[in-house]
Amino acid sequence: MSLLSMLFGNKPKTAHLAKERLQLIIAHERDGGGSSANFLPDLQRELIAVISKYVKVNTEDIRVSLEKQGNYEVLEVNIVLPEKG
């Protein structure tokens, strides 16, 4: 490995790195109650409002989903940020 490769190496692209950092996954153990998916539209609207204060994003660039995996519910929030340019 050359000195230049060690110094500059292969760095991940900024958009890909931002996507990885902004993928937020929250899991909680299901308590057997009713479905909690009815809060997703409100959550998505509030996320858009908060994120829009700091970054200009399209509403289509924010995805909120809830999946059941065994005894857990996984809430996934994906936010695609615009490229700096």
Swiss-Prot record:
Top-level taxon:
Bacteria
Secretion signal: which residues? none
Q: What is this protein called?
A: Cell division topological specificity factor
Functional description taken from the UniProt entry? Prevents the cell division inhibition by proteins MinC and MinD at internal division sites while permitting inhibition at polar sites. This ensures cell division at the proper site by restricting the formation of a division septum at the midpoint of the long axis of the cell.
Provide one Gene Ontology biological process annotation: cell division
Q: Which keywords label this protein?
A: Cell cycle, Cell division
Name the gene that codes for it.
minE
UniProt family annotation:
Belongs to the MinE family.
Organism, per UniProt? Dechloromonas aromatica (strain RCB)
InterPro entries the UniProt entry points to: MinE, MinE_sf
Q: Which residues form a coiled coil?
A: none
